[in-house]
Regions:
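Bacterial N-terminal signal peptides that target proteins for export
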Residues: 2-15
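Bacterial N-terminal signal peptides
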Residues: 13-24
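Boundary at the C-terminal end of the N-terminal hydrophobic targeting segment
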Residues: 27-32
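N-terminal propeptides/low-complexity segments immediately following signal peptides
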Residues: 34-57, 61-73
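Mixed-charge, low-complexity intrinsically disordered regions
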Residues: 37, 69-242, 251-255, 342-628
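A recognition module on extended beta-rich or small alphabeta surfaces enriched in W/G with H and D/E
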Residues: 227-259, 303-351
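Short, well-ordered loop/turn sites that connect or cap secondary structure elements
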Residues: 265-273, 277
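Catalytic Cys-His active-site segments of thiol-dependent hydrolases/isopeptidases
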Residues: 280, 288-310
Length: 628
């Protein structure tokens, strides 16, 4: 399958998961057996929602042992009419985070609760100063060394202003899609601000779920935190209703309920700490700084509650306007009609979101380009720096860097390798989480999940297919960048600066020095360490298993019998490892494809040379493009 066709396909499915979230569980099971391009069976009634507890992992064990729920709606009123929800005042002694009871379609208000930790609202809207302080709050988290959402918010280094202002034992947990909402809600709570966020989505008007047509969504439910406010321990678990589908909203939006975010122009004023990045292949990140080289640094969260850091580059896909991909900012919210009490707190009122035509930095230029003759087809968009057209990711860098900035091939190569090395270190931690949880000691399941990149349960928490695809893409991008620098040279591009005498030799020397400095270690099944250099990783990259049921030796691509001697995988696991090779060879995260294969399915696909996976891994060797 070509990359462009794949993108059409995954946009066509449009995270059909979002639609499934609005169905009872019995209907979801029926839909799971139906190809996504066919009509789904009608939902059947079920007896109440069933909770799914978060798995305790080493990353979450540091948090207090209060129940945390990863909730998804199980039932809703007939006809999907608005479900009434009235605020109820009640004293709170000790509140634990429990699952919400029903699908929140329509407008809903958080229940008011009295007590020391009530979310008291003293101001009606964010100011420019609030936005600056929020940006600083995000920057400090990003530049700290905190490893989980809980650690970040309870650390005096990562969160110096608010770390001590929590109810005793309050846990903090956010994964991929939750993170932007969680951090925005947290800052609003700490600063006496109201907050509203989407709780349910459906297909956007004019969008169908037919195979081959792009899908995008509209908001059909919102949760409003207005005065008198709730206890935050009740309000925060509501954020678990959010999925990546809540970001897959079109730039030109026609839904009745306004979305949480809006697309912005690529400028320093709009791309800053707190801005959100939506990768259309299914991941969310939050910008924490833009450096003097125009590099966008971000934080992102994962199902095991870990928090990692990265740099925006070509590995993050550019998407079309209907996908909602790219850079977004929070839509301003204003509390209107509230009354102020003698103690300064507000009561009553309702939240109003600012419409697109009121937003000074709303822009769709990241989809349609900056050329005066904008193309209707986003794939043909041209991005200009002055009068010169550049590719999109270079455009982002040059727009955000100081005027006149030029790329230094040596420094770009150095930073690419360092970013890869940081990603490898983060993978070490991710694999360790699965090993510490004992997943590799469990029997191999008879099938893969319905999609290995977008799923729930232990696979979501412990498997690394998306992380590994990102890592492989980074290796490929390194090779492509070096090849481009070597081919073009500074004399042929006004955006490249190089002061040396032999660019190829200097690139090769930089590559060698940085590669030698990059080393990671993992623990084998018996606890003994294995030290791997950059060259070792490059050689075994497409042998590294993403499957958490495999031993750590195979998770790190071991092939030497001596290294594998401590691996306890049985014949079934070895067979699965071998059969997954085609999936390991691919870089594209096929989030729109059904992938609940058996072992025999994978073997048959290899025999028939199907379009699932790739027969051959891509070339990621850098030295070969520099040595003639």
């Amino acid at each position: 399958m070509s990359k462009s066709n794949f993108l059409k396909l995954c946009l066509a499915r449009g995270f059909a998961v979002a639609s499934l979230l609005l169905l009872p569980s019995a209907a979801r099971e029926a839909v799971a057996e139906t190809p996504f391009w066919q009509a789904a069976p009608a939902p059947s009634k079920v007896q109440g929602p069933q909770p799914q507890k978060r798995a305790q992992t080493p990353a979450t064990k540091g948090a207090p042992k209060t129940e945390s729920w990863r909730w998804r709606p199980e039932s809703a009123p007939d006809g999907w009419s608005e479900f009434p929800f009235s605020p109820v005042a009640a004293p709170v002694e000790a509140v634990s985070a429990e699952k919400p009871p029903v699908a929140l379609i329509g407008d809903h208000v958080a229940p008011s609760m009295t007590g020391r930790w009530q979310w008291k609202i003293t101001r009606a809207a964010w100011t420019g100063q609030d936005e600056d302080r929020f940006a600083e709050f995000i920057r400090l988290i990003g530049e700290s060394n905190c490893k989980t959402t809980h650690d970040c918010l309870t650390s005096p280094i990562a969160n110096p202003l608010y770390h001590g202002n929590h109810p005793p034992g309050m846990p903090f947990f956010a994964d991929c899609a939750d993170l932007p909402f969680y951090l925005r809600a947290y800052f609003s709570w700490q600063n006496g601000l109201p907050f509203s966020f989407s709780t349910a989505v459906s297909l956007h008007p004019g969008t169908t779920a037919a195979k081959g047509s792009p899908s995008s969504f509209q908001v059909i439910g919102r949760y409003h935190i207005v005065p008198p406010g709730p206890d935050p321990r009740v309000a925060f678990p509501e954020v678990a209703r959010v999925s990546t589908a809540h970001f897959r909203l079109p730039a030109v939006y026609r839904g009745r309920m306004l979305p949480d975010h809006y697309p912005v122009a690529i400028t320093r004023e709009s791309i800053k700490a707190g801005t959100i990045i939506f990768d259309p292949l299914g991941h969310i990140a939050v910008v924490y700084k833009v450096d003097d080289h125009g590099r966008v640094h971000f934080i992102d969260a994962h199902p095991d509650n870990s928090l990692t850091r990265g740099v925006y580059d070509s590995e993050i896909e550019r998407g079309g306007p209907d996908s909602g991909a790219g850079f977004k900012r929070w839509r301003p919210q204003t509390l209107i009609g509230a009354k102020r009490a003698a103690d300064g707190t507000l009561s009553g009122g309702r939240l109003k979101l600012m419409s697109d035509n009121q937003l000074p930095d709303w822009s769709d230029e990241q989809y349609h380009g900056t050329d005066a003759g904008r193309s209707a087809d986003w794939r043909s968009a041209r991005f200009l720096i002055g009068a010169d057209a550049v590719d999109y990711h270079a455009f982002v860098r040059l727009r955000l860097a100081p005027a006149g900035y030029k790329f230094d091939p040596i420094e770009e190569t150095r930073q690419r390798i360092r970013n890869i090395c940081r990603e490898l270190e983060q993978r070490v931690a991710a694999v360790d989480v699965a090993v510490q949880a004992g997943i590799n000691k469990r029997p191999q399941p008879p099938r893969l999940p319905s999609n290995i990149y977008v799923t729930q349960g232990d696979w979501e928490t412990y498997a690394t297919p998306s992380r590994d695809a990102q890592l492989k893409s980074m290796f490929r991008a390194l090779r492509e960048d070096v090849a481009r620098f070597a081919a073009i040279g500074p004399s042929q591009s006004k955006f490249i600066r190089y002061d040396g005498a032999d660019l190829r030799a200097d690139l090769l020397g930089t590559y060698g020095a940085e590669a030698d400095a990059c080393r990671v270690s993992y623990k084998k099944s018996d606890g003994s360490p294995v030290h791997l250099g950059f060259a070792d990783i490059k050689r075994r990259l497409f042998s590294m298993s993403f499957d958490p049921y495999h031993c750590p030796e195979r998770r790190w691509g071991a092939s030497d019998p001596a290294e594998l001697a401590t691996c306890n995988d049985d014949k079934t696991k070895v067979s699965w490892y071998e059969a997954q090779q085609r999936l390991r060879n691919q870089l594209v995260r096929t989030i729109g494809d059904r992938m609940d294969f058996t072992l025999e399915d994978l073997r048959r696909q290899a025999r028939e040379n199907s379009d699932v996976g790739e027969d051959v891994a891509p070339n990621i060797d850098v030295a070969s493009v520099l040595v003639k």
